[in-house]
UniProtKB/Swiss-Prot annotation:
Keywords: Oxidoreductase, tRNA processing. Residues 121-217 form the Rhodanese domain. This is tRNA uridine(34) hydroxylase. InterPro entries: Rhodanese-like_dom, Rhodanese-like_dom_sf, TrhO, TRHO_N. The active site is at 177 (cysteine persulfide intermediate). GO terms for biological process: tRNA modification. Its EC number is 1.14.-.-. GO terms for molecular function: oxidoreductase activity, acting on paired donors, with incorporation or reduction of molecular oxygen. Catalyzes oxygen-dependent 5-hydroxyuridine (ho5U) modification at position 34 in tRNAs. Belongs to the TrhO family. It comes from Ehrlichia ruminantium (strain Welgevonden).
Length: 272
């Protein structure tokens, strides 16, 4: 039996997010849904996996709450369930940029996946990857800028430095991330710095793969995922990765550690 992997987020005021946690956890456990859901006063962010029937029930359950109804989600498939358990976490921020004194309510404009290739191929557009270095090491869009960050909280310092040294007075900026949520905040931060022409890939890399299949080959390599698939190609098929210690190929069934993109086989894990 195959599994459906669903990623989604929504920025919405959830004053009772503490109370939502046990309800969602119980529903997911009862319906054999596994993954991670993050709740904050700012909204919800999640990647979950289960049968198609279970996920249909889950989104119907969310529809009962007007704040969470009609969620748009990205869907892919996995031969094995990429999660071992169900976690529902509470956070102060839905996605932590580490900067509080800026207006994060107005982000950049969306670029649909179908129009993304033409947009970033323009000579007057600066394409910025908002992900971390360990993610970018697996793959990226051609000629995109790597901020070389270790975590998302490092992005503001890089952005401030880049703004001071920018080549153009008012550059056109295109930004992207895995599923879109980090761009909601990072584009808002760029606009807060004074940039006016800020855009981002709607739905992120995963939606781009699903919608375009990387038809123009502007994506190079794999996309890192925050689950046991570790990486997927432009057809959303999990790829093979190598153990960082011995170099042996590590298949999905043998995954032992995916901490920050570092993969260990069973043998090496036992000796660390």
């Amino acid at each position: 039996m195959g599994y459906v992997v669903s990623t989604f987020y929504r920025f919405v005021h959830l004053s009772n997010y503490y109370d939502i946690r046990p309800v969602l956890k119980e529903f997911c456990v009862q319906n054999n849904i596994k993954g991670t859901i993050i709740l904050a006063e700012q909204g919800i962010n999640a990647t979950i996996a289960g049968s198609q029937n279970s996920l249909d029930k889950f989104f119907s359950f969310l529809d009962l709450d007007s704040r969470l109804c009609n969620l748009q989600y990205h869907k892919s498939f996995s031969r094995c369930n990429p999660f071992s358990k169900m976690k529902v976490k509470l956070r102060k921020e839905l996605v932590c940029l580490g900067i509080e004194d800026f207006d994060d309510s107005v982000g950049g404009e969306y670029i649909d996946p179908e129009n993304w290739d033409n947009f970033i191929s323009r000579s007057d557009v600066y394409t910025i990857d908002t992900r971390n270095s360990y993610e970018i090491n697996f793959g990226k869009f051609k000629n995109s800028i790597n901020p070389e960050t270790n975590c998302f909280r490092d992005f503001p310092d890089w952005a401030i430095s880049w703004a001071k040294n920018k080549i153009d007075d008012d550059p056109i900026i295109a930004m992207y991330c895995t599923g879109g949520i980090r761009c909601e905040k990072s584009t808002a931060f760029m606009k807060d710095l004074g940039f006016s022409k800020v855009y981002h890939l709607k739905g992120g890399i995963l939606e781009y793969f699903k919608s375009t299949g990387n038809i123009n080959n502007l994506w190079e390599g794999y996309c890192f995922t925050f689950d046991d698939r570790i990486i997927v190609d432009d057809k959303l098929v999990p790829g093979d990765v190598k153990c960082i210690l011995c170099g042996a190929h590590v298949m999905l069934e043998d995954m032992k550690s995916i901490s920050r993109g570092h993969v260990l086989c069973f043998s090496c894990k036992d000796h660390v």
